[in-house]
Amino acid sequence: VTARSEYRTTRNLSLNISSYQLVEAVSNEYVIGLGYKFTEFNKVLKMKQTKDFSNDLTVRLDFSYRKSQSLIRKIEDNFTQPTSGNIAKTLQLSADYGLSKTLSLRAFYDLQINEPLVSSASYPTSNSNYGISLRFSLAQ
């Protein structure tokens, strides 16, 4: 079993002296990931076992939540206005199965959801990707 968690933050400030404005860009992101490795998964599939290779299945699940926004602070008027920003949620699920020393099979699903914080900037979108890949490795 593997587990991970991350917290990332960024903040950029830009001062414009001629217009008395401070532009602030802030981003906060949380990431949570889980993984599990099923050793000798071919026993579950009731397949013939090889002597020198263990057919392992590795499953991973990652979720991230990121909020980013840009603000214009007018120093002279003591006024703050959001100009852009969004909330991005990402879900990634993958399973890797070793068929042999050089051949592996991978299935994956990715989901990305973007929601704007400022309604005039954009509209909510979601993208999903899924698929199966077969990898052949020449290195041993």
Where are these regions (language model features)?
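Exposed, low-structure sequence patches enriched in small/polar residues
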Residues: 1-140
